[in-house]
Amino acid sequence: MYQSSSSTSSSSQRSSLPGGGGLIRYGSAPGSFLNSVVDEVIGGGSSNARDFTGYQPSSDNFIGNFFTGAADSSSLRSDSTTCGVNNSSDGQKQLGNNNNNNSNKDIFLDRSYGGFNEISQQHKSNDIGGGNSSGSYSLARQRSSPADFFTYLASDKNNFSLNQPTSDYSPQGGSNGGRGHSRLKSQLSFTNHDSLARINEVNETPVHDGSGHSFSAASFGAATTDSWDDGSGSIGFTVTRPSKRSKDMDSGLFSQYSLPSDTSMNYMDNFMQLPEDSVPCKIRAKRGCATHPRSIAERERRTRISGKLKKLQDLVPNMDKQTSYSDMLDLAVQHIKGLQHQLQNLKKDQENCTCGCSEKPS
């Protein structure tokens, strides 16, 4: 994760040459996350502590001032990635002003960025060995990714273990156990304070109990820790515990998708055991279907009309059965009118009749 001893020595030799130059490598951590961490830890300090400028030919002195760390501040490094630093009195006198101005900031930045002090000490060795020549550009390598930092802390060779049920990372062993414990608790205590936005959708399901550490799948820290009792700028990744309503909803879903109980099975058996001649439910047919009530009524009406027209065909002579219903009705009307005219003529003939049959009996 950090520079090895061979790369450190090669870079120091390269920077000590009169025309040697190098490249500054920055880790691509989220800028907003790192800026917020620095602002919270420093407490609103100057923005020079996080002014990551790009590659500039004239920014050698500025980068030197930025990466100058406290000589006595301890940095998190493994046994194989230690960096040799020349702590001579001349080097301390040369960088005395920068150490006095930036000692507190470097300590806090060392807590926020894993190998910051290691990089600053490498830069001091480069300045002491080769001097600050105008033609050489100091090169530093910085890894500030939080994921790599957590991986570095979780390694076994650093004597740090993550076997506590809470998410507070604590050292177990090592030469600087007490100091590292306070540093890590001040840096990595993810508490339940309401400092960030809440996420109510995720429930708390503990996993990974047997892998050396246990944590909640909902957040980094679901248990309450007492590392920030004074309330001084804690970094809180919090998730609220599920409410009673969400628990009820989850239980309802579980009972919905689970197998039915014995009582429900018995009820379904009784419901399905129906008589053969009974209809469990009468479904109304759609419009236009043969079983729809209006369709049935229309069919009955047409059947009734067809029966009457058949009787009319028998009464009306010379009516072809292949004619339409309208023609049949016209012929029937004409036939009825003819019959009425004949009836009127017969009545007139009866009134004008003079025979004896027309006389009334006395």
Swiss-Prot record:
GO BP annotation list: regulation of DNA-templated transcription; regulation of potassium ion import; regulation of stomatal movement; regulation of stomatal opening; response to light stimulus
Entry GO MF terms: DNA-binding transcription factor activity; protein dimerization activity; transcription cis-regulatory region binding
Record-listed Phosphoserine modification sites: 189
GO cellular component: nucleus
UniProt KW keywords: DNA-binding, Nucleus, Phosphoprotein, Transcription, Transcription regulation
Residues annotated as transmembrane: none
Domain bHLH: 289-339
Polar residues bias locations: 78-96, 162-173
Subcellular location: Nucleus
InterPro entries registered for this protein in UniProt: bHLH95_bHLH, bHLH_dom, HLH_DNA-bd_sf, IND-like
Ranges of biased composition (kind: Low complexity): 1-16
Domain of life: Eukaryota
UniProt-annotated stretches for the region Disordered: 1-23, 78-106, 120-140, 162-184
Subunit and interaction comment: Homodimer.
Protein name listed in UniProt: Transcription factor bHLH128
